[in-house]
Amino acid sequence: MRLDFVTLFIFWEGTAVASVFLIWARGTEGAYYTGMRYLIIQIASGVILVAGMALHYHETGSLAFGALTLGSLGTWAILIAFGIKAAFPLLHTWLPDAYPAATPTGTVVLSIFTTKLAIYSLARSFAGTEILIYIGTVMVFWPLIYAAAENDLRRVLAYALNNQLGFMVIAVGIGTPLALNGVAAHAVAHILYKSLLFMAMGAVLYRTGTAKASGLGGLYRSMPITALLCIVGGLAMSTPLFAGFVSKSLILSSVAKAYEPLIWAALLFGSAGIFYVAGVRLPYLAFFGEDKFAGAPVRPKEAPWNMLLAMGLTAASCFALGLMPATFMSFLPYDVAYDAYTPDHILTQLQVLSFTAIAFFALWRFGLIKRPAPGILVDSDWLNRRLALARAL
């Protein structure tokens, strides 16, 4: 099969059409309208992509899917199309809207494929494009604001996913072999630990009927294995001995070697922020704190064995890749010597993670952080609501 923009477009639109059924499978009226919004935005990205392809072909006579520079209207259109699917700032609202609306299994599948296609496309066409460094930096910070206040824990994970995409976009912007290895490694690690967290919240939704923090708490008493696996998913984001530590170390090192100290500091802060919202706050709100089921006639049961098996295998994969970094990195696209387990990498991450956890529990203990109240956070999708796209078509 020829690897050109025509082939990319076919699969680009194919993923959009196929994935919307994962949302509609939820079977609710809200899921139907969410699916329509998702489909409109994804098809729009395809239209922009084909327009960019046509302009690029007119300018160069080529449809080769390779390195591009932002020197023409066509390549800018292609970048915008990629940016929609990669959830660039202000183009990202479909992600926290659609992912929590899907079935528990559908959310996991969406988190694996949809945005990773865009990251692959960016890495193939725009590696070393400086503007991506700054776009990615905004992506690291912007979603944390919403994730820290969101009540729906599956939406928290959707915003956390957006944050992690920012790490990959920054590395694509750096564009060195080490950075692109970091993109590939982090895409794999992110698929594993974010799938584990989405599965844990899916199990909670399956057993309790809600993923809202305002209605959860104390579940560790009846879902201890799910609680443990959720904690493992949080640790796998950047704790030594897990896959996320190896992949984030690659990205942080590539940024440091590119002499971008402010971006490096931003990524370190972003690592702390995402561990706060998804690695500490999310498990605490779901499984600990006030027991919301203490007076219930029947307590929720532990997740079914098939869910536990899927989560267990994913957790083991996170651990295996972190425990064998040389094997992990042997599958990366570039042959670059790198040691993730140096004392400075380990100490830096452990300091960031431990101080973040201590800060959360200290703030919670003194009442400075409270369980979120029911409600809807209005993101930059307020325009959609104004234009009544909530009931499009």
How does the language model describe each region?
Residues M1-L8, V17-E302:
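Hydrophobic transmembrane alpha-helices and their helix-loop junctions in integral membrane proteins
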Residues I10, A18, A51, G166, ...:
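Hydrophobic mid-bilayer segments of alpha-helices in multi-pass membrane transport proteins
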Residues Y57, G202-Y206, G322-Y334:
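Juxtamembrane/transmembrane-helix interface segments of polytopic membrane transporters
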Residues L110, A296, A303, M307-L321, ...:
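Membrane-interface and transmembrane segments of multi-pass membrane proteins
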Residues Y159, L321-G322:
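Generic beta-strand/beta-sheet core signal
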